[in-house]
A protein has these predicted regions:
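Nucleotide donor/acceptor-binding cores
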Residues: 2-3, 137, 142, 225
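Short, acidic/turn-prone active-site loops that include or flank metal/cofactor-
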Residues: 28-34, 72-76, 96-99, 173, ...
Length: 268
């Protein structure tokens, strides 16, 4: 029977279904213990991880039976995909499975920040009455810039355009938009930075995209946009982000991911 090792959290229903077909070893703490993982991975045909398990060459060279790696998520920056390719180890991300969930986060976060809900809430519970001092805006006919127009970026565009936002999308690998459900215009990064009231990032973390959104990027943003990152920490230079916010160059930000997790004190 095929043996599968799971090193991070998986929901109970999925685990039960896997157990019906495979010999499964589940230990969600293994992601924190590379030495132990190196020792036991040699006995398994398959490996299932999230983003904490660093599937590097130290682990892979000991995975002598490994045929496939399942990634419970989309990004593959924690997996040495080049090594896997050379060793004929198939790597399968859960592409598209979380698209609706991420799109809902982007829409709800942008609405919350556009309408200044956190500011109103914080002021009210302090005994203040910020009704006349905090100004919110309507999103109708405002611009949403999407950086990275894959499955999730397209779902964000679909949701957002139905709420009245004008959608600009940047992706060097997308040449045209064929889906009639998606009302978006392919744009340059420069146009997105200059026009957008909200910017949402949906990129993999690579050498090319690391710190891609930085001080230079923020200096080009003319409308003091809201910044939302649900892709990978490290794509935004976090120090530059905080500086841009403190200087009122951006109106706010919502981060679902950070370069270091748990987060550092600079965000407190």
């Amino acid at each position: 029977m095929t043996k599968i090792l799971i090193t991070e959290f998986i929901n109970q229903n999925s685990l039960e279904n896997l157990n019906k077909k495979f010999d499964v070893m589940y230990n969600e703490k293994l992601c924190e213990n590379e030495k132990q993982l190196i020792t036991i991975v040699k006995d398994y045909d398959g490996l299932i991880v999230r983003n904490k398990t660093q599937v590097n060459s130290n682990i892979l060279k000991n995975a002598i039976k490994l045929k496939f790696i399942g990634r419970l998520g989309v990004g593959l920056d924690n997996i040495d995909t080049e090594y896997c390719k050379n060793k004929n180890i198939h790597v399968q991300p859960a592409t598209g499975m979380n698209a609706d969930s991420v799109a809902e986060y982007v829409v709800s976060s942008s609405m919350s920040l556009i309408k200044k809900i956190p500011m109103f809430h914080n002021g009210t519970i302090k005994g203040e009455w910020p009704r006349t001092t905090i100004k919110s805006i309507e999103i109708n006919h405002k611009y949403l810039g999407i950086i990275g127009f894959g499955t999730i970026g397209k779902k964000v565009a679909e949701y957002s355009s139905k709420n009245g936002l004008k959608v600009l999308a940047y992706d060097p690998y997308v040449k045209e938009i064929n889906n009639k459900e998606i009302n978006a215009k392919l744009s340059s990064l420069k146009e997105i930075y200059e026009k957008s009231d909200i910017i949402s990032i949906h990129l993999p973390l690579t050498d090319e995209t690391k710190n891609m959104v930085n001080k230079s990027s923020f200096s080009q943003m003319k409308n003091k946009p809201i910044i939302i990152n649900t892709s990978r920490g490290g794509i935004i230079n976090e120090s530059d982000l905080i500086e841009a916010y403190n200087k009122n160059n951006i109106s706010g930000f919502a981060l679902d991911v950070f370069e270091k997790e748990p987060i550092e004190s600079k965000f407190y």
